[in-house]
Amino acid sequence: MMATSIVGDILNSFILSGRLGYAEIFKSPVFWLCLILVVLAGLLAMPLAVPIGPMYWDTYIYLDATQRIKMGQIPGADFSTPVGPLGYYLFTAGLALFPKAQLLLLAQWSMLAAAAPLMAVVLGAIGPQRRALAFALLVPFLIFGIFPANVQAFHTYPGLDGFGIYNRQTSLLIYVLVSGLMFIREGRKLAVFCAIAKLCLFLTKITGFLVGGLIGLAALLAGRISVRSTILAAVLFLAVLAILELNGHMMTAYLADIARLVALNEEALLPRFLTVMSGKLDVILPSGLLVLAFSGST
């Protein structure tokens, strides 16, 4: 049903553009999204060489996971992984399609296979009447999705970052989720959209899933999504997890890995939290002051 909706949104966009003239096609944000995806696919088909920095352990983990998946092993059940299995399966499929692809770029861009269709739904929901708004959402999405670099610099060597891939992909999915909650009308379509977005977050990184849950709670309290749609999204989400569990107890193994990692890093959680808080103080402090000011004015 979601795939039909996505295809329908894209076709409706092009049909409407065709009626207005071929020049209108270039004004469609969905057209530019599809065009850039084609360009990225072309780049993956080429044997490119890019600097990935001295800290490239995440890129190596992708290669190890891909080799294990090709041997028939299941992430979580047969080998431990630091995050969810979605990124590894997308990378494995991408490597089969583009065997000459630059590995970091493939790892970074493979998540677009899940995020781009969801973003197309958001752009279709905005409609041609508000194209400026649609492009304002599309440009950051493409920047976050395409450029494999972290916000903070950990080394002085110029180049890209071969680590932190999961965090970048999680941020991209959260961006898509927030966009959908803001611009898709309340109803079944929004419920299915949220279920798929939350499923992608859960299967990518559990911390992103928790953040997405808080965002969903805020949307529920703000009236952007109804209780009925929330329940429908939760049912769809759990149904897919139940199906995935049949694949060698993948989900219970994934949750066991999460519990094991939390236990191993329990003593380091508070220092890491304080490190993140101090690193993002320029955002957290002004935001907190704005919340206090708004609360005081009301």
Positions of PLM-derived features:
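Start-transfer (signal-anchor) and selected internal transmembrane alpha helices
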Residues: 1-44, 131-137
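Transmembrane catalytic cores of multi-pass membrane glycosyltransferases
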Residues: 42-62, 68-70, 79-86, 102-106, ...
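Transmembrane alpha-helices of multi-pass, membrane-embedded glycan-processing enzymes
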Residues: 87, 91-98, 104-119, 167-173
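Transmembrane helix irregularities
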Residues: 97, 165-167, 200-207, 246-247
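Transmembrane-helix motifs of polytopic, lipid-linked glycan transferases
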Residues: 106-145
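Aromatic- and kink-enriched transmembrane "portal" helix at the membrane-lumen/periplasm boundary
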Residues: 137-171
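Specific aromatic-rich, kink-prone transmembrane helix
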Residues: 161-186, 191-193, 197
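Membrane-interface alpha helices of multi-pass inner-membrane proteins
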Residues: 178, 190-206, 211-219, 237-241
